[in-house]
Amino acid sequence: MKNQVLFVDDEALILQGLQRSMRGMRNEWDMTFVDNAAAALAFMATHPVDVIVSDMRMPAMNGAQLLGEVMKRYPRTVRLILSGHADQDLILQCVGSTHQFLSKPCDPEQLRATVCRAMDLESKLKNERLQQLVGRMEHLPSVPSLYSEIVDRMHDPETTLEDIGVIIAKDIGMTAKILKLVNSAFFGLRRQVASPAEAVAYLGLDTIKSLVLSMHAFSQFEPDQTNAFSISRLWDHSMQTAAAAKRLVQVELNDRKMMDEAFVSGLLHDAGKTALAFNFPDQYGKILEQTRASSADLLRAELEAFGANHADVGGYLLGLWGLPTPVVEAIALHHQPALTSANTFTPLTAVHVANAILNAGPAGTPVVDAVYLERLKLADRLNGWRETLLNPATAE
């Protein structure tokens, strides 16, 4: 069965151009082209749509409003905005409801690749309930103290972009949304940004203020919303994993770009847990209580209860948001690194090893994928990595 893709644009010439440029995908996609939001919603009422690609500026109902309505009615549909207008108000209006932003005119190959990637992510998460769960998520929860800190600092006229970048780099939810926005086609960057501090410097303080203070991107965490899940504990582990993964890349390759990717991957590697904990608080709380001693038991319990584990959910969600592919892969596969086709040291390697070493602690034995490390010819490096992370003063 072919995937259904719906294109929406009120300009007839643009719509015709899309039809011509996407003609080569007719054997793989069922495509429908409509010229207004009402027609799009009418079509979706009778046809399941996998991906919707909408123009931003349209009469009656603009693209941001349309995708907001699609998110409410059909949360599993992947939502893409196609526009030539880098208007800040419109960007902020659609941050929550849009998975990715594409600029007009959009290179046909980029559009095809983006839609194909979205479909590939969807195929990896077949569970209907989780598809709907992830599709509805506008934000990942943020630690209250960090949220309060960033708001307070923004009211201080002496606060710099670097100050805000440091705060955002400590927070899972803020990092994910800021990276989603700065990597959108609206900003026209020629490379993907993986560093929160660099993203803040590029977006500017006014945009960051609008994002945070309008609550389009972030929300405060309700401490009593879950029983066993602790966002503070997750933050602590995620920060440690991020720093450790970055350090491993520095030791192995000293590649600045990969160091940034490894840091963000480590910071977000357990982001899927927030989706499960926030949407199934009682059920997930019980699972956490029953599987405290073993990550393998946790993965099995998640799979039995939800049809996917937290790594699947996190990778799917952040992939939809358009984070760099190495980051998405590291998040999705950090418990199953052998599933990657890569045969070299990547951010996935760093996060997998860092997570295992930190979970084991000084007295434990890291539970790593030995077959994967053997394939990379890196198995003999494990003890050295462990020494580097747990005893940095004595490591070489």
Description of each model-found segment:
Residues 108-288, 292-366:
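Conserved alpha-helical "signature site"
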Residues 58:
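Receiver (REC) domain active-site loop signature in two-component systems and cognate sites
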Residues 35-39, 62-66:
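Acidic catalytic/metal-coordinating carboxylates
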Residues 9, 55, 83:
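Active-site residues of response regulator receiver
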Residues 12-32:
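Two-component/phosphorelay signaling modules centered on CheY-like receiver
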Residues 7, 27-35, 43:
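Short hydrophobic/Thr-rich beta-strand motif most characteristic of the beta2 strand and flanking loop
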Residues 6, 47-53:
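Active-site beta3 strand of CheY-like receiver
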Residues 65, 78, 85-102, 109:
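Alpha4 helix (beta4-alpha4-beta5 surface) of REC/receiver domains from two-component response regulators
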